[in-house]
Amino acid sequence: MNIAKIVREAREQSRLTTLDFATGIFDEFIQLHGDRSFRDDGAVVGGIGWLGDQAVTVVGIQKGKSLQDNLKRNFGQPHPEGYRKALRLMKQAEKFGRPVVTFINTAGAYPGVGAEERGQGEAIARNLMEMSDLKVPIIAIIIGEGGSGGALALAVADRVWMLENSIYAILSPEGFASILWKDGTRAMEAAELMKITSHELLEMDVVDKVISEIGLSSKELIKSVKKELQTELARLSQKPLEELLEERYQRFRKY
């Protein structure tokens, strides 16, 4: 598949969402709401569910599947209260010894005036800091777009995976082209240079696994992700805490 098709597929409105994966993979998934400071951000969803006999905290960025839903979800662009909600749930997971699984699909954090006034940069930075030392296993999965710091704020993890037709980048191809050439129409040319596809990033050791989507129905893809999670969480849970944290630290220091 060429780069233009991959970018279109990553942004496709019909792609599986965080809630599709959360309810399809985890039994008895219960959503939790709010950051306990300002409000509940519809762009970030999270809660607790069971993976076999293991309780897991699930957090992710939610895009809508219709215009009405996208307005509710702010088109998957979190406000600072969304990142603070995510951090609240991750710290709760740490307190009770639950592993964390994050699902990421965002063009980036919301850049509006209100978001900046409420500390968007601080909220993202704090998530990076806290996740780097969170004392439970973390797996992050990019399921569509992984855009800039808005995606990275949920991706400081022991394992970072990508669905095959997802992308992960410092900014959008359109933004890159506008900055580099002052011409947003050269976005796909920029995408080729940026190396944003799953297989390119796996080759560069930015991500640890690419989960195939080819020929799989939605149910089959969810089942595949569930199987991978069960295997990897069991493996990570066996690691001594000091080793887990040191490997996570070294994973990101090497960049």
Curated annotation (Swiss-Prot):
GO terms for biological process: fatty acid biosynthetic process; malonyl-CoA biosynthetic process. It is an enzyme of class 2 (transferase). Inhibited by pyrrolidine dione antibiotic moiramide B (CPD1). It catalyses: N(6)-carboxybiotinyl-L-lysyl-[protein] + acetyl-CoA = N(6)-biotinyl-L-lysyl-[protein] + malonyl-CoA. Its EC number is 2.1.3.15. InterPro entries: Acetyl_CoA_COase_a_su, ClpP/crotonase-like_dom_sf, COA_CT_C. SUPFAM superfamilies: ClpP/crotonase (SSF52096). Residues 1-235 form the CoA carboxyltransferase C-terminal domain. PROSITE patterns: COA_CT_CTER (PS50989). One of its GO terms (cellular component) is acetyl-CoA carboxylase complex. Component of the acetyl coenzyme A carboxylase (ACC) complex. First, biotin carboxylase catalyzes the carboxylation of biotin on its carrier protein (BCCP) and then the CO(2) group is transferred by the carboxyltransferase to acetyl-CoA to form malonyl-CoA. Belongs to the AccA family. Acetyl-CoA carboxylase is a heterohexamer composed of biotin carboxyl carrier protein (AccB), biotin carboxylase (AccC) and two subunits each of ACCase subunit alpha (AccA) and ACCase subunit beta (AccD). This is Acetyl-coenzyme A carboxylase carboxyl transferase subunit alpha.
